[in-house]
Amino acid sequence: MRYYIIAGEASGDLVGGNLIRAIHEQDTHANVRCWGGDKMETAGATLIKHYRELAFMGFVEVITHLRAIFRNIEFCKKDILAYKPDVLVLIDYPGFNLRIAEWAKKQNMRIAYYVSPQVWAWKEKRVEKIKRDVDKMLVILPFEVDFYKKWDYKVTYVGHPLVEVVREEKNNVPVISLSDKPVIALLPGSRAQEIKVKLPIMLRMVKYFPEYCFVIAQASAQPDSLYKEIIGEEPVLLVKDQTYNLLKQAKAGLITSGTATLETALFGVPQVVCYKGNAVSFWLATKLVSVKYISLVNLIMDKPVVTELIQGELTEANLKTALTRLLQDEAYKKELKQDYETLWHSLGDKHASVNAAKEIISLASGNV
């Protein structure tokens, strides 16, 4: 059967890559066309657009790129029509994918959505469009089942795809040592604009902790030059395509909010969650977003498990205080370890990619 899959960010590429492998295992004649990244292409899909051409974050940034966004939407529609998929699979990326879903429904296409938009955080009324346009919603967070139940919309919890990825990495991939010193991981994000804002603040920690080796996880879609310009003469390491190897040996991490916070927690690394965006975008977000926390770890656990330094709170002094606590407060580290274990078990031992592929293949076969 023919599968058209759309992911617009690095996290979606990771999820999509594992999904595509699972689809090929269950449907040996599968033909997959996608918008995504290197992982999806490596898994066996024909890559049409790379997410680095699509990833705009924040209200202001989206507005300034509206022409490119609408051009991509029109190109996507034409490409889907030409391909004639048995099922359209949308992975997160709601600003783009919900528009495509509305259009595709009018074309009488079968539509699966894997990784729900965070409608529980903001613009909750989008659920009405999801109910109208999406045939099968596959969620990855346990609390999303009850959220959608409020809207009388039955969804399928398949498990969190990161659990299976991290389990495989922990069990089967040996650690390659990065330094003789204990390591602190810096994950400044995958988009150029967020790296330019957060990495300089993270690098200010180097002088306070000379007994540690600071290692930056380079986003695969970003050039070396972006990082080297920011790093300057700082004595740090820059590694590419080694994020999990880095997390397996890190004593602590300074982590950009997003999927990386959950990955870091699943590897058991004490972390400080860092967020700093465009001032106008952040102000608008505070008016529209209705969640207590910014990190997935705290959202899932429904309590402040990890420290979040958001916008004006992300200062050199605050970051130093938070990192010192991670490295030196043994009671806090013990409590954090226990919370991380609870988090792991709350996400279950489901095989998300296999379960999602099964549901998608069933839908492609005409079973809604």
What is the predicted role of each segment?
Residues 1-368:
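Nucleotide-activated sugar donor-binding and catalytic core shared by glycosyltransferases
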